[in-house]
Amino acid sequence: MPSGSSAALALALAAAPAPLPQPPPLPPPPPAGGPELEGDGLLLRERLAALGLDDPSPAEPGAPALRAAAVAAAAAAQCQARRATGLAPEEPGRLATSETAELELEVDEEEGEEAELDGELLEEEELEEAEEEDRPSLLLLSPPAATASQTQPIPGGPLGSVLLPAAGFDAREAAAAGVLYGGDDAQGMMAAMLSHAYGPGGGGAAAAALNGEQAALLRRKSVNTTECVPVPSSEHVAEIVGRQGCKIKALRAKTNTYIKTPVRGEEPIFVVTGRKEDVAMAKREILSAAEHFSMIRASRNKNGPALGGLSCSPNLPGQTTVQVRVPYRVVGLVVGPKGATIKRIQQQTHTYIVTPSRDKEPVFEVTGMPENVDRAREEIEMHIAMRTGNYIELNEENDFHYNGTDVSFEGGTLGSAWLSSNPVPPSRARMMSNYRNDSSSSLGSGSTDSYFGSNRLADFSPTSPFSTGNFWFGDTLPSVGSEDLTVDSPAFDSLPTSAQTIWTPFEPVNPLSGFGSDPSGNMKTQRRGSQPSTPRLSPTFPESIEHPLARRVRSDPPSTGNHVGLPIYIPAFSNGTNSYSSSNGGSTSSSPPESRRKHDCVICFENEVIAALVPCGHNLFCMECANKICEKRTPSCPVCQTAVTQAIQIHS
C-alpha cells in the first residue's frame, strides 16, 4: 500500500496543471504507518475533536488516514475559494503540500467515501457557522491576543476565523467581517463604531469635536454687535418710540434685537444690540422713521403760519390747520395722563392735534375740517377753563383781559363789564366757565349753560351784542360825572326777588351821561379807603381799588362827541363766546349748585328750553315765550335784535 501510494502521487503530480504560487516545498511526508503519519493522525484527531467531530471507528485500520484526507480536502477547497476572493491569507506550506498529496492519492481509490465525508463535514460546518452568527461582535471586540498566540489557530471558531489573525482588524475590516460571518448590518455598524471609538486616536477625535463645539459657541456669541443710531431731536425719539413704547417694542420683535431708548434730557441716540444683520435692519428702520418724521415737520413748518392762531394752507383738500396757544403751565393739563385728554378731543372732533414739545412754544396744532378744528379749539379752551378755574384778578397787570380778548372802551364801543367785588385766592375762586359756541348756531346747544345763584340770576361775560351801551341789573344806574366815575351805591347790595321784573320789561333806564369831549377832565383819580364788609353780586367797583375800567375811561374817552341818551338794556345772553361767571365772593355770596340745572327759558325761567327763533337760531326760549315774541308788532330776537319770522320747536 505504501508503494502504490507513492506511484499514484507521482503520476498525479506529473499530470496536474501548474499550481498556484506556493511557498518552498517541505520534504515529502514519510510513508504511511511511520511515526510522522501517526503524529499527523493525532493532529487531525485533535482538530476534529475541536470541531465537534467524533471518530466513528478509531480502532479500524486506515480510518485516521481517510478522515485526515477528507478534512484536508475540505480545507484546501475553502482556502482556494478564499484566495480567489482575496479574503484569506496563504496557508502554511507544509500543511497545504501534505494534504494536497493525500487528497490526490485517495481520489482514484475512494471517491464514494470522500463524497459522503465531504457532505457530512459541510453540514457540520454550516451548523457551527450558524451558531457563530449570534456572536460576531464578540469575535470582533475581543482584545488582541499575545504575539505568540496570533499565529496559533483559535479553537472553537469557524475555519475562516482560524486562518484570519484577530490583531489585523481595522474599522472597515471589522464591518466586512461582521457581514461575512453572518452578522447583520446593525451589528456590523455597531462593531465598527465601537472599534473606532476604542481604537488608537479615538480620544483625540472626541476632544477635537468638543473643542469644535466650544469654538462654534464662541463664534455665535462673538457675532453680536452694538451700534449707536442718532436721531435729530427728542421729538424724533418720541415719534419712533410711540405711545407707551408700542412702536419700539414692535421694532424689537421684528428685528430680533435689543434697542435701548434714550432718556429724556440725554442725547437722542438709540443703542441697538444683536446680530450684525439684525442690527443693520433695525438701524435702517430707525433712520427711515426719523427721516419720515423730519419730512412731515418740514412740510408743516413750510405751510405753517407766521403768527399763532392763523390757519395755514391745508394739508389735504378741504382741511386746515389752526394753532392754539395755551399757557406753559397747562400744556400737560391739556395733554392729560398718557395723552388721554388730547386723544379724547381728537376722537370727539375728528381732528389731528400735534402737541408742543418742551423746548418749543406752547402751541397746539389742530388739523382737520374747518368746523372740526373750531370744535377742537373750543374743547381745549373749555378743558383749561374747567380744570384751572379761570378768574379775573383786579391788579395793574390785568387790564380786563378775558380769554385773550382786551375788553375795553376803545374804538368808541362801550363793552359790558362784570366782575366780582372781592376776588379771593385761586383755591377759593369760582370757576368761570369758558363755553364756546357750537358750530350749528351762534350760541349752540350749550348756550344756556351757566351757574345760578340762590336767586337764579346769572352773571354774564364781558362780551355782549349790545355794544351801544353799558348794561346793569337792578335799578337805575346813577349818573356818572366826569369828575368821579367810582360809585358806591347801596342799591346793588341786594338783589330783586322777582326775576320776571328784570327780564320781561326790557325798558330803557336812565342813559349814561357825563362823557364829555374834553379828555383832560377825566384824569382825576379817586380812591376809597374802606373795604366793603359783604361781597356783592352787583357790578359795583371795589372801594379799595380803582377799577381799570374807570382808569381807562378817564384816559381814553370813547369819542370826541357826547354820548348822551344811550339806552341801557338788560342783556339776555352774550354773543360770540358764551363765558359765564358766578360770584366768587365770601361766605355770604351765592354758590353754584353741584350740577348744572336743566336749560330754562331765559324769559320766564319756568319752562324748559324747547324753541328756537328763525333765522337767528337762538334756542333760549320755551315755546310759549317764543310764540309771544313772534306775535309782537315788530318781532325781534331779544339777544341779537334780529328780525324774527317764526319759532320752531326743538326735539332732542
Swiss-Prot record:
GO terms for cellular component: cytoplasm; nucleus. Residues 544-555 have a biased composition (Basic and acidic residues). One of its GO terms (molecular function) is zinc ion binding. SUPFAM superfamilies: Eukaryotic type KH-domain (KH-domain type I) (SSF54791), RING/U-box (SSF57850). A zinc finger (RING-type) spans 601-641. The modification Phosphoserine is found at residues 530, 538. Residues 225-286, 319-380 form the KH domain. CDD domains: KH-I_MEX3_rpt1 (cd22423), KH-I_MEX3_rpt2 (cd22424), RING-HC_MEX3C (cd16722). Residues 101-134 have a biased composition (Acidic residues). This is RNA-binding E3 ubiquitin-protein ligase MEX3C. Its EC number is 2.3.2.27. Residues 15-39, 80-136, 429-448, 506-566 are annotated as: Disordered. Phosphorylated. The lineage of its organism: Eukaryota, Metazoa, Chordata, Craniata, Vertebrata. Residues 430-448 have a biased composition (Low complexity). Binds RNA through its KH domains. Residues 18-33 have a biased composition (Pro residues). It is an enzyme of class 2 (transferase). It catalyses: S-ubiquitinyl-[E2 ubiquitin-conjugating enzyme]-L-cysteine + [acceptor protein]-L-lysine = [E2 ubiquitin-conjugating enzyme]-L-cysteine + N(6)-ubiquitinyl-[acceptor protein]-L-lysine. Keywords: Cytoplasm, Metal-binding, Nucleus, Phosphoprotein, Repeat, RNA-binding, Transferase, Ubl conjugation pathway, Zinc, Zinc-finger. The keyword Zinc-finger applies. Coiled coil: none annotated. Residues 519-537 have a biased composition (Polar residues). The gene is Mex3c. The keyword Transcription does not apply.
